[in-house]
Regions:
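Outer-membrane beta-barrel biogenesis signature
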Residues: 1-7
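A short mixed-secondary-structure module that forms the rim of ligand-binding clefts
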Residues: 12
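Outer-membrane beta-barrel porins/channels
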Residues: 8, 16-20, 24-167
């Protein structure tokens, strides 16, 4: 756990790409011992897909295809994590993390959310036992949608076409 960092200050950075570079994952963290029994950490995570083609305006009102009307957007999740761990005695350590989450789907929608994790570790001789609770509150998100009338009309047309196809 966090109480076992072996230096007074630790910094971690990571970048990974998935699906031939389409999706990108970035992570950064800084951890610091507060005293001999406790430590704190601040972390940042971003997972996103950039340059997604927005084809909602590809076809104009007369049914003409115009590729110049394609725009691009990003869909990404970002999380800020604040963690704290404390060694209660030589055998027992506990800790927790509070997460603030921001989600964005282009200019169409965004959300703010939060979540909590906790953990405890007990060591008995050479045996180690641990328990973890991830997303104990679930990860609560409040979404805001930013759709203009034209976008809503496109959405209804797409739903109607889908229903007609599977009648």
């Amino acid at each position: 756990g966090l109480t076992q960092i072996d230096q007074d200050l630790q910094i971690g950075l990571m970048h990974a790409e998935y699906f031939a570079g389409i999706a990108k994952y970035d992570y950064g963290s800084i951890s610091k011992n507060i005293d001999k029994n406790s430590a704190a950490s601040f972390s940042f995570i971003r997972f996103g897909v950039d340059n997604i083609p927005n084809t909602t305006e590809l076809i104009d009102a007369q049914g003409n295809v115009n590729y110049d009307r394609i725009s691009y957007f990003t869909a990404a999740d970002m999380a800020f994590l604040m963690s704290y761990g404390r060694k209660l005695n030589e055998n027992l350590s506990v800790g927790g993390t509070a997460k603030i989450i921001n989600r964005k789907a282009g200019d169409f929608a965004n959300a703010w959310g939060f979540g909590f994790d906790f953990g405890a570790k007990y060591q008995l001789d050479s045996w180690k036992f641990a328990i973890m609770g991830k997303d104990i509150t679930s990860t609560f998100n409040v979404w805001n949608y930013h759709l203009d009338d034209e976008m809503i009309n496109h959405l209804y047309q797409s739903i109607d076409l889908f229903i007609e196809q599977y009648k």
